[in-house]
């Protein structure tokens, strides 16, 4: 039973772990006319996950997963968020994540944008890291479920060298709901298997006697079984077996009654007084 429980949990958690982030990087590109004149460039932003880095070369799909928002202004920049999946030879390119930039309040102070892990992506992995951006402060990562950002970008497969345009929309809300339901189902499966395993170990392996309520239920079941037999007009197997044993006694009694009338009368009186 414990083996079944372990394997069921492993199989149930496989779908949740197969899309885990292994290596993430975020690249910021400046759009013309967005920042003030004193801001000329944006440094590269790198977000490294706790997992080991892996290198993939196959570009498959484009999807928006998060919004990098900086409080205090409506300026926007273009964000290319690239992450690698655990699945073999699969790499996703995510583009057009919007940034709302906040200009510097104090020009002399050095400004930086910190990515606060406030939202979860699919399997619960948090986007972590720091963004050092001139003229921007108080930045945080927001889930793309609040808004849908349709993206269109070329995707290249190994068999086809030409770029093919694919359009994908964000489905973080559905993924979060699926995660919640999968967690509930896993808990129910684990509880059911655990209770059944404990019951089998206690009452079957160690042969612990049933409690009083269990014995009462067993008697009730036996009474219902006998009542059904009587209703059908038959007799239980136990009573049917006792009849052949009683027939020879009746034959012997009849022979004794025929040989001695007095004894037969006495026996008859005894039976009458007894009943």
From Swiss-Prot:
It comes from the Eukaryota. Residues 148-173, 234-264 are annotated as: Disordered. Residues 148-158, 245-261 have a biased composition (Polar residues). It holds the Pfam family DUF4711. The chain crosses the membrane at residues 187-207. Its main location: membrane. GO terms for cellular component: membrane. It is a single-pass membrane protein. The keyword Transmembrane helix applies. The keyword Phosphoprotein does not apply. Keywords: Membrane, Transmembrane, Transmembrane helix. It is found in: Membrane. This is Uncharacterized protein C17orf78. It comes from Homo sapiens. The lineage of its organism: Eukaryota, Metazoa, Chordata, Craniata, Vertebrata. The gene is C17orf78.
